[in-house]
Design a protein with these regions (language model features):
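Core nucleotidyl-transferase/polymerase catalytic module
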Residues: 7
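Catalytic core of non-heme Fe(II) oxygenases with the double-stranded beta-helix
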Residues: 12-95
Length: 170
């Protein structure tokens, strides 16, 4: 779903966004939150997406005015182990994409300890962020460091990289 010309100079997959899909557990009830609304990824070049667990209905849609139904341009089920790669103007600039829903039929759950959450699907999205936009934790503004510190501290418990990033920060 992309051409060689869609690869910017210096392109390489240097970041990974990990999304957990499943249900919030509140008062003994499961509230399904396994979806992502329509959006565009603005990083240059193709995006590679690896899906694990329950299958998800992935759609490309046209933008519309609020209150109107979106037109589905392309859709596909992303099964356990699926690798999807997309890029180019058609899929990154002219259309939005979304995860419309995640099945429960396979009975997949992950033994991941996130308080109040049951994970049925994990998605790893790899993309290229130009080097000039990658900022070390120590060089973030004081406010940005404060906002992200708790998360980085949690990551540092199991990662030498994040432990070093915390140590280097003022």
């Amino acid at each position: 779903m992309f051409q060689g010309a869609d690869l910017p100079s210096g392109w390489h997959l240097n970041t990974c966004l990990v999304n957990f899909y499943g249900a919030k557990l509140e008062g003994g009830k499961r509230i399904d939150t396994a979806r992502v609304g329509e959006h565009k990824d603005f990083e240059p070049g193709p995006v590679a997406s690896l899906s694990l667990g329950e299958r998800a209905l992935f759609q490309f849609v046209t933008s519309s005015r609020p209150g109107e139904r979106d037109e589905v341009v392309e859709q596909q089920w992303l099964d356990d182990g699926s690798l999807q790669i997309f890029g180019g103007d058609q899929w990154k600039k002219r259309t939005f994409h979304r995860v419309q829903r995640v099945d429960t039929k396979g009975g997949h759950t992950f033994d991941i300890h996130v308080a109040g959450f049951e994970t049925r699907r994990i998605n790893f999205t790899f993309r290229y962020v130009p080097d000039e936009h990658v900022v070390p934790f120590a060089k973030l503004s004081k406010q940005a460091q404060q906002d992200g510190r708790g998360y980085v501290e949690e990551l540092a418990k199991h990662s030498k990289f994040f432990a070093a990033a915390l140590k280097a920060a003022p």
